[in-house]
Amino acid sequence: GAKKLLQTLRAAGLRVYILSATRHALLDPAIERLGVAPLVDGVYAEEETGSKRTEAPYAFFRDRLGVPYEKMLLVEDAPRNLAAAEALGVSGVGVYDESMKEYTEMIRAGAAVYLPDFSDLSALEELLR
């Protein structure tokens, strides 16, 4: 599922970066195991950029890549992170996660697009046009 999502983002001509709350010691092997490393331009942990609940990681990518907030896209399963991004003008794509199922409606409400799974990415493709 996630691989299809990354391929869709790439096909739209986007640079793709992974930012996770997970530390590199666990994150990097997972990315390799899933076979998605060739689909991303970089991998960062919040320990490097700051929490997604704050402006810090978005400012990090803005300053490092020269991408204004309104040109960024956050794919996220946590409503607080989507809200923080939206407050800055970053578009959010909400995704379903079993561990966050009690927050599904908040995630759906806080996202420009909501993906209950990765089987149908047409709403995302429409957003990217």
Per-region residue spans from a language model:
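Short, acidic loop-to-helix structural element flanking the phosphoryl-transfer center
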Residues: 1-18, 24, 28, 55
